[in-house]
Amino acid sequence: MELENYEQPVVLREDNRRRRRRMKPRSTAASLSSMELIPIEFVLPTSQRNTKTPETALLHVAGHGNVEQMKAQVWLRALETSVSADFYHRLGPDHFLLLYQKKGQWYEIYDKYQVVQTLDCLRYWKVLHRSPGQIHVVQRHAPSEETLAFQRQLNALIGYDVTDVSNVHDDELEFTRRRLVTPRMAEVAGRDPKLYAMHPWVTSKPLPEYLLKKITNNCVFIVIHRSTTSQTIKVSADDTPGTILQSFFTKMAKKKSLMDIPESQNERDFVLRVCGRDEYLVGETPIKNFQWVRQCLKNGEEIHLVLDTPPDPALDEVRKEEWPLVDDCTGVTGYHEQLTIHGKDHESVFTVSLWDCDRKFRVKIRGIDIPVLPRTADLTVFVEANIQYGQQVLCQRRTSPKPFTEEVLWNVWLEFSIKIKDLPKGALLNLQIYCGKAPALSGKTSAEMPSPESKGKAQLLYYVNLLLIDHRFLLRHGEYVLHMWQLSGKGEDQGSFNADKLTSRTNPDKENSMSISILLDNYCHPIALPKHRPTPDPEGDRVRAEMPNQLRKQLEAIIATDPLNPLTAEDKELLWHFRYESLKDPKAYPKLFSSVKWGQQEIVAKTYQLLAKREVWDQSALDVGLTMQLLDCNFSDENVRAIAVQKLESLEDDDVLHYLLQLVQAVKFEPYHDSALARFLLKRGLRNKRIGHFLFWFLRSEIAQSRHYQQRFAVILEAYLRGCGTAMLHDFTQQVQVIDMLQKVTIDIKSLSAEKYDVSSQVISQLKQKLENLQNLNLPQSFRVPYDPGLKAGALVIEKCKVMASKKKPLWLEFKCADPTALSNETIGIIFKHGDDLRQDMLILQILRIMESIWETESLDLCLLPYGCISTGDKIGMIEIVKDATTIAKIQQSTVGNTGAFKDEVLSHWLKEKCPIEEKFQAAVERFVYSCAGYCVATFVLGIGDRHNDNIMISETGNLFHIDFGHILGNYKSFLGINKERVPFVLTPDFLFVMGTSGKKTSLHFQKFQDVCVKAYLALRHHTNLLIILFSMMLMTGMPQLTSKEDIEYIRDALTVGKSEEDAKKYFLDQIEVCRDKGWTVQFNWFLHLVLGIKQGEKHSA
């Protein structure tokens, strides 16, 4: 494509420049305010003649200049005065670093575009009354082979080469890598090495009432193991692990030899660890607050602990940081008063304030270049250009249509209605290519707003974004050739378009992608967005006057609406006018900030004045749903997002784990790689190994599946891996090796068998042969299970491994437990899947865990079984095999064949066989009632469809649970064009038979079922906003069933938003009656399922 070579730079306010030239020269003293000269002593890399003393240069540096200009000034002085001038002729300024010392640490002055007077070192020297300050000029050395090898190891773990900058148009990736060094080092230096090594999994939430009932006199029994012996001791639920160890050693004072404890050792030499798991009970936390202890109490299991030596904190050693630190002032510009061109001599202007740019923003569309044309002939094409901020389109223009050829040239300027000074930080220039048949697009002028009629007939083909203000706060300028993303066709990938269209990354596949050439105005100086200086709001007092009662009620009604309720223009106007009143109610914040006109600089300044007075927000209790709302795709302002992150700081580790999936997705909505949210995730991952483990897999999975955000997730993951320590790096390496090896085996097995449900004996034989080869050659001897880092799997039990009868041919694998302190020989069962995106299953299982925590606050234990499931790559993942459980289909078939679907008594008889003792049978029925109620409510609220007897399971203790969540939010499956879901949830006659009832009869167990359902349903209604927000944040991730707000409307309807508590109760009881009336339809579907073998055996036991 031939492009123009030169465009004239824009000259800002020519009249101002002429006026400045006529000004009389002022004295040095008077000019310091506009062009401050700062004395700095530079220590040069060369030595004085005949000594080892380094040369120095004392310079007076212009405060308004940037670092690059300062470096050039040093170089010119060195060339003039150094005894080693040849050295400076040979090596230019870019071969050297500028370093300064602060509190014993070396910091690099990294950003060459940073204005000198904003440097952190100047502020530091001022506090110390040090003048002149000292900057060391140090030669840049090539990385050592050891450094390069470590980087290769990190890149392999990340699944992406973070050093590859061939597909970026600026240095944001490298810039962020450097900026994240400081928070990483601060967190590593501040963490407790012993606690980090043992990462106790605790909670500070009160013990639920139903668990309190299981503790007699506030005491629990603990079995402590050592070697081949054990000792049972009675302890208070309020005792800490340290107290328990002390009591144990007092009791065993004369029997140490029985427990294989050397006489010289005491309680300080040991810790308590869960038998068979890498899970420690340490710290000053009462034993009742350890999650493992609560799990044992909940399941009625004994608490078995092993007396163990603590792990060596040295194993978590972090490799010495090779990069100097960069401070948080790096990349920050000055205030408007420092950058403005007004009242300054021309010679004193080095960087110009964006707020001085009063002209409208414009872009020149030069042309597009496509490697392969669409097959359809006689098409025309046009470019639509939007200034976008989050989900808001601030203004829009488009070119005229032209015939669609391999190269289309426009060479036309599009001028927008927004002024340059009003561009907010994070604003995107969104470029989209539309095409359509020639008549549909005729007669349009170049800068016209698109007509809905013509655009409706055109098809969006390609898109790309450019951040208009870069990560350094500088306005983009000059020519760009941007490689565009192609819009996915129909299918699963289309679901991610909502998130993908916010990315500022260009398509790395340069050879095969559409490219667009644009030109932005050039300027004589860099244009910088100034920092906002907190100033009083002159309108503040006027708008804080007493509100009329009618308007107050109207405002309260707006604030009370749920997150899906759209705000009208009138609503927004009211919220903004009474912004100081809205500020008093934290619930108003998402709606208030949605009402801000982010494309007006004066309004943005007033918004920051508001944010400075957010005491009510800071002092309010944490509302996770509310806080997460400010992190969704509707908010791009870094200050708004930062107050949300600041609120999340009070989340305890267990809650961070609950919401980690959404928090990782929310990183996509950040305009820049470095953000408060990215730093929060980094910090919490480095503080707790369990969080770090899941952060690793959530990030790695996104890097593998989301090309649009690969770089962003990769830079965060690299920062984490550089601080997590040697032991974690070793664990991750083993896990990645295992997954890579099993993936190859799965692909080979799939290629051996056609895409059908049966599995031949030849395929099973091949699997066993391949697994034996792995075991004998290079499979790691042990590895942490990705969905449960407390478990370590050892050798494969090959005779128990098989290929499952399903289209995707998942592998059923069983491993020995690698921990010798495990109490049984039970294997660790894992289903390894290739070909399915497990992120939707992960989301549903995560929501089930959150529902459990909601019900816990109401003292409800609904016996949900959210089994382990994790996506480990692009359509790769692992699912936990739940022990001693089977599908309803198997139970029905094993008794009377396919007609078992119509036999009401089959399930009850099976449970009786598994629990022959009456007391155990009654306990199993009780568990069945609660778990059935829990899953009825959960599957109804989440709209989980495609429920058949092969994806509903039951354990031998009566715990019902659902698996395989491919259809959610009411996106139900049809069979022969008929909707298969004729009931709100699954409550079949055989389920009712277990509860002691049939037809319209009742029983004590059925009444209990109804009561529990209603309590569980009403409890979820109190958290409607949280559930809506959690799904909203996953809306843009690429899940085929979660692509629009209409999908999430399902939850709103299911929870009867707007109805009274009494009406909601009646509504759910009515749903139960619908299920009782139509239970036979489910049985008929199940019969068809058994006969036709639809998805038969796809996910047995997980």
From Swiss-Prot:
The keyword DNA-binding does not apply. Residues 797-1080 form the PI3K/PI4K catalytic domain. Pathway: Phospholipid metabolism; phosphatidylinositol phosphate biosynthesis. Residues 803-809 are annotated as: G-loop. Signal peptide: none annotated. Residues 217-309 form the PI3K-RBD domain. It catalyses: a 1,2-diacyl-sn-glycero-3-phospho-(1D-myo-inositol-4,5-bisphosphate) + ATP = a 1,2-diacyl-sn-glycero-3-phospho-(1D-myo-inositol-3,4,5-trisphosphate) + ADP + H(+); a 1,2-diacyl-sn-glycero-3-phospho-(1D-myo-inositol) + ATP = a 1,2-diacyl-sn-glycero-3-phospho-(1D-myo-inositol-3-phosphate) + ADP + H(+); a 1,2-diacyl-sn-glycero-3-phospho-(1D-myo-inositol 4-phosphate) + ATP = a 1,2-diacyl-sn-glycero-3-phospho-(1D-myo-inositol-3,4-bisphosphate) + ADP + H(+); L-seryl-[protein] + ATP = O-phospho-L-seryl-[protein] + ADP + H(+). InterPro entries: ARM-type_fold, C2_domain_sf, Kinase-like_dom_sf, PI3/4_kinase_cat_dom, PI3/4_kinase_cat_sf, PI3/4_kinase_CS, PI3K-type_C2_dom, PI3K_ABD. ATP binds at residues 829-838, 864-872, 961-969. Residues 541-723 form the PIK helical domain. Activated by both the alpha and the beta-gamma G proteins following stimulation of G protein-coupled receptors (GPCRs). Activation by GPCRs is assisted by the regulatory subunits (PIK3R5 or PIK3R6) leading to the translocation from the cytosol to the plasma membrane and to kinase activation. When bound to PIK3R5 the PI3K activity of PIK3CG could be activated greater than 100-fold by the beta-gamma G proteins. Residues 943-951 are annotated as: Catalytic loop. Residues 357-521 form the C2 PI3K-type domain. Residues 962-988 are annotated as: Activation loop. Residues 34-141 form the PI3K-ABD domain. Belongs to the PI3/PI4-kinase family. Heterodimer of a catalytic subunit PIK3CG and a PIK3R5 or PIK3R6 regulatory subunit. Interacts with GRK2 through the PIK helical domain. Interaction with GRK2 is required for targeting to agonist-occupied receptor. Interacts with PDE3B; regulates PDE3B activity and thereby cAMP levels in cells. Interacts with TPM2. Interacts with EPHA8; regulates integrin-mediated cell adhesion to substrate. Interacts with HRAS; the interaction is required for membrane recruitment and beta-gamma G protein dimer-dependent activation of the PI3K gamma complex PIK3CG:PIK3R6. This is Phosphatidylinositol 4,5-bisphosphate 3-kinase catalytic subunit gamma isoform.
